[in-house]
């Protein structure tokens, strides 16, 4: 398994798999196969894939620990950047075909429509995460500060779920499903943090062992 995860070709294969949804959308645009409301179709498709890639990204840490596959970490940055790629497409379909690049109209929407406000907040939160995803930024910020910044991906995922839930008016099964996944991952993360914190406190409070008697 380790040989498979560390192979450069596995990373290439994962990259190509991540591009399949984009390729499908491009093909549908070329064939004019976007349904009765093309803009709505594109917005929903890109929004769905944004949430999916956020969930994929959040799954990396628990999976690598639960299944003892540390090399899974090689794919986390790629999956996170694909989440950013699809949210950018989501935003472009809103700003372009929907709003006709009317920035004033967009800001009115952001201010007046709660589901857009929350979605826009999630998009903005992802921008610094994408920018600082490189090893150079880890060195500049320092490991701890970088980790604290990148934990905001959980807020992005929560905002994305709320955005989706408020958007749909009748069938809420998909946003509830995504919400359940994000909730489970967040609870796991909190549990892992409390466990580590408790272990660290226990080590500090434990009595030091007496030094061995060198005369014996």
PLM feature segments, named:
Residues 1-216:
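Membrane-embedded alpha-helical bundles that constitute the cytochrome b-like, heme-associated redox core
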């Amino acid at each position: 398994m380790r040989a498979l995860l560390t192979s450069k070709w596995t990373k290439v294969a994962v990259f190509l798999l991540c591009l399949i949804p984009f390729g499908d959308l491009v093909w549908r645009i070329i064939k004019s196969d976007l349904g009765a409301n093309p803009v709505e179709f594109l917005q929903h498709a890109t929004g769905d894939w944004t949430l999916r890639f956020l969930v994929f990204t959040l799954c990396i840490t628990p999976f690598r620990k639960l299944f003892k596959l540390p090399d899974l970490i090689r794919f986390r940055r790629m999956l996170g950047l694909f989440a950013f790629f699809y949210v950018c497409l989501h935003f472009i379909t809103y700003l372009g075909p929907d709003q006709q690049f009317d920035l004033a109209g967009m800001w009115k929407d952001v201010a007046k429509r709660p589901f857009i406000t929350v979605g826009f907040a999630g998009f903005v939160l992802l921008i610094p995460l994408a920018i600082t995803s490189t090893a150079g930024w880890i060195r500049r910020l320092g490991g701890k500060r970088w980790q604290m910044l990148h934990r905001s991906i959980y807020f992005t995922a929560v905002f994305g779920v709320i955005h989706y839930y408020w958007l749909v008016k009748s069938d809420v099964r998909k946003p509830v499903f995504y919400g359940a996944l994000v909730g489970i991952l967040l609870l796991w993360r909190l549990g892992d943090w409390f466990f580590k914190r408790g272990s660290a406190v226990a080590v500090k409070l434990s009595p030091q062992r007496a030094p061995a008697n060198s005369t014996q």
